[in-house]
Amino acid sequence: MTTRACVGLEDNEWQSAVNSRILPLFLLFSFFLSIFEAVIKNIQSTETMNRLRYFLVALAMAVAALLPVNTWAQFNWPYTIQNGTIITQVPERPAGQQSALGLTVEKIPVVRVAFVGLGMRGPDAVERWTHIPGIEVKALCDHERDRAEACQNILRKASMPAADVYYGENGYKDLCKRTDIDLVYIATDWLHHYLVAHEALEHGHHVAIEVPSAMNMTEIWSLINLSESKRLHVMMLENCCYDFFELNSLYMAQRGLLGEVIYVQGAYRHELSPYWDEYWKNGADDQLGWRLDYNSKFRGDVYPTHGLGPIAQVLNLHRGDRMRTLVAMDTRSFNGQELFKARTGEYCSDFKNGDHTTTLISTEKGKVIEIHHNVMTPQPYNRMYQLTGTKGFVNKYPVEGFALAKDVMAKAGVNVSKDYTGHSYLSKEDTEVLLKSFTSPMVLRYGEEAKEVGGHGGMDFIMDSRLVYCLQNGLPLDIDVYDLAEWCCLAELGSLSMNNGNKPVQVPDFTRGEWSRFRGYRHAWAKPEDEAATRAAAMEFTKQLKAKGAKYWKKASKDAD
């Protein structure tokens, strides 16, 4: 039996990269670092110290930009350890560049969309979008041509015209050069999320990126700067923020039913044994598939956003509070190593991702966040989603329920049979009474149609509908680039913590000083009269588009005969 140590790149890839570009750049970086360390000992001025630090960060980003594409996926962001705490560098906002907080753009009455990545999730997204008025699918792209072509049948079923097809390793680059696309919807493997998004943003397109949208700090800061400088939306497609229970719980928290929410839990605990073989493999020699391969090479919570996203909105992160300090711990790999061996016949002596990873985060306002990641051990599906407030408690897994103080609900106009606080969940009857007054406006607006269209019980459809709604009405998106940064940073920051003996890591302020500019998380809505006019125009466009599509497919069938 062969034993192999798992590394970020295969041996031949590393050798080629080192020989051609990485080694010279690394030596250059090391040279400047040695100068920095020598000079810093004699510096007394804090301002001068900071300038040198910013120079080092800029140099690191320049080096990263010149590296081969596959090195973008590495954990390599510069950091220091000060008084036992790991502090990553925060690059200065370039001169003339403005924050993207509350970013709005001109209304887009008809959202022209291109889909990139049509394997597991992409086709379902195409199908959902055919139910949304005021959209036009302009392009379909996948590494495998047949996958992209297959999605034409979805458009045909919806009586929408065929879209242009792109395929191959660089198909997305040609797609992004088009000028008739408003939004690029990205559902590729993880390593291509950033690459496609970067290309799209550079060509002036808004992007919606599947989770996790960025795999490391380099990609995170790059997306922030692109969104800010280009004034383009960067939305992470975190569907769990749109699940019915989470939306209703968020609404209750915003209305004060939980008092002050002080402790929250979230997770992605989902044993993936039925799915490992479904992940795309790049040729016959790829025995692992992209997701298991990634887990073998990277430590940390590499899939944090399903658990973190919904609870982050409850805590108003970068809207009055911010993540401050992170500590992570993990088990070693047990089942992960066995999966590797079963698929390759080789024993991986250094399978990076532990079977179970736990991350604790404290916030500026004294709250605590607990996040779990486990895709390796047998257990029921569990995103945890637990909110502990000074006046109430919410829990979703494994038991779904609310435990709220009777006096709080009485003030809110909800009469219940008894005080459940600290003892048991509300009865089914009292929960129904509660939801009559505290069902989220989002659920009221989209819930019934979402159940019909589907997509993880309807939450995917609500997510897509809200994205289109905000673009059509010129509103800020529900999830911005700073949400993306905060929710995705757990991977590299957690790895830093664990690789340094579980030291605390200072979570950077991705807004660069503006985290308290807005007070409280809110969904944006247009004025009723504006909303009605926008929807009427969208419905009319779709009616005409479907008439055009019906003629197109009738002719296509006739030509085929």
Question: Where do the PLM segments sit?
Answer:
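Short, positively charged and aromatic/hydrophobic N-terminal segments
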Residues: 18, 22, 35-41, 45
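N-terminal Rossmann-like dinucleotide-binding module
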Residues: 75-158
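Beta-strand-loop-alpha-helix segment that lines the small-molecule cofactor/substrate pocket
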Residues: 183, 189-190, 194-242, 256
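Predominantly a Rossmann-like dinucleotide-binding segment in NAD(P)-dependent oxidoreductases
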Residues: 230-233, 240-351
